[in-house]
């Protein structure tokens, strides 16, 4: 199994919207990727919660059956359609993939 964890810090304003609006839109778009390929075991997109400590605005925690499933997800057109929007609104990104 491969775990794929990504955290994004968003710009204060981008694409004509504020950080909170863009975070909600990004979550909506990423949620559409939750079942686009076989082998996605877990797919959680979460926004930072005001009452809990967070240095990033949005996190994706996902588990894939194997490397092939992760690669299929990354290459899938639905995922690729989200990439330009995320690139336009993000200030920073951290990612870690690891096998368990």
Protein language model features and the residues they cover:
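Short S/T/G/P-rich N-terminal loop/turn motif that feeds into the first structured element of a domain
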Residues: 1-56, 65-71, 99-100
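C-terminal structural segments of small proteins and small subunits
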Residues: 64-89, 93
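A generic hydrophobic-segment detector
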Residues: 92-100
